[in-house]
Every structure is written in C-alpha cells, then in structure tokens.
C-alpha cells in the first residue's frame, strides 16, 4: 500500500503494483508525502490520517489473473497453493478444479479474485477507483489526474517505464478447457460483470 496526501494506492496481488511502486518512488514530488505501507495491506488497515482519501487500485481479467497467480506461486509456494496443487505436483487446470469443486477450499465461495478485491478494497468496491491493468498506463494517468495534478516527469515515466516483475507464460486462453473456463467465469462473476471482462482467444 502506498500513502500520499492525495490518495491511497492499494496493491492488489498480480495487478501491476510493482510498476506503480516504481513510478511513485522515483517520481512522486516531495509534497505528495509518499509513504510505503505494508505491501498488501487492505482498506481496513489504512491509517486514520488517510481514510478520507480516494482508494486507488487495479483489477485484472480473472482468466489472466489466475494464470499469473499460479505461475508466481510455483516459485513462492505458499500454503494455499500447496494445498490446491497437492504440494506442487498438479498443473494449472487440475489445481484450479481442486480449489473450486468438490471439497475444495473455494468450492462454496466466490472466486479468488473477487474475494481478494472485496477484502482489500471493501465489499462492492464502494468508494474505490479501480482501473484495469490491461490499459494500465492510461488508467494510472486518469486516476492520478482525478486526485491531483500529475507532474510532467511522472507522466513521461508512466508512458515509458517498462513493465515490472512480470511472469513469462503463454496467453491465458491456452491454460483452460471449456469446463474450467465456465467454472472461473461463474466463480468470479462479480469481477467479470463489474469491469466488463470477457474471454479472449490468443492473438494470431
């Protein structure tokens, strides 16, 4: 989480937060009073001094988000990943089915991205300004600009700085079969519907 006197940026995992971190750390004016808070702190942890400020964040197509999260966890291997992947032995499709069906840990709840967004930004995202990572540069300029004047050097950096901490993998569509595609669409329906996300085939 990044605190300024103009806004609070909440870092949703796997939605470009490292890019935002670099932009703010390298280019935020001193009078923005930038403070780096706990990396993945939620809206409930925003200090009282900043709770009146706009909450900014990014969302991502859930189909893409699940694939990115899975690849990241193949290195991190946290307890949740180890549980759904049978200690790292299952591939993406089998691990996701294990999480979302039968006795899986998320079988009787909403999808992982829906839960993450609501936990970190508030149920229904009320009061939050949430951009789409698929057009991150334009969205970041828009969201910052709605809160304060954005310095020219920061505008240039947002337009030019390379993506940060990205994982290398094929287009998300190659990871799904029709059954898993429908399952994730159902589980994360609130995110798909709120942001207008849809399935996209890999570019030719």
Question: Which ranges hold each PLM region?
Answer:
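Membrane-interface amphipathic segments in extracytoplasmic regions
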Residues: 1-204
């Amino acid at each position: 989480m990044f605190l300024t006197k103009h806004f609070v940026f909440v870092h949703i995992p796997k939605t470009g937060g490292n890019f935002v971190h670099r932009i703010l750390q390298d280019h935020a004016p001193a009078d923005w009073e930038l403070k780096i808070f706990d990396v993945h702190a939620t809206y409930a942890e925003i200090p009282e001094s900043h709770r009146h400020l706009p909450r900014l964040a990014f969302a991502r197509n859930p189909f893409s988000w699940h694939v990115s999260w899975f690849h990241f966890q193949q290195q991190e291997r946290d307890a949740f990943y180890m549980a759904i992947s049978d200690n790292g032995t299952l591939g993406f499709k089998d691990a996701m089915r294990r999480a979302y069906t039968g006795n899986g840990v998320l079988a009787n709840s909403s999808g992982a991205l829906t839960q993450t967004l609501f936990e970190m930004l508030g149920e229904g995202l009320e009061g939050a300004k949430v951009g789409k990572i698929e057009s991150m540069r334009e969205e970041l300029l828009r969201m910052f600009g709605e809160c304060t004047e954005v310095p020219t050097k920061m505008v240039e950096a947002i337009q030019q700085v390379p993506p940060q901490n990205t994982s290398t993998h094929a287009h998300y569509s190659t990871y799904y079969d029709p059954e898993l595609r429908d399952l994730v669409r159902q589980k994360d329906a609130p995110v798909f519907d709120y942001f207008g996300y849809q399935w996209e085939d890999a570019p030719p």
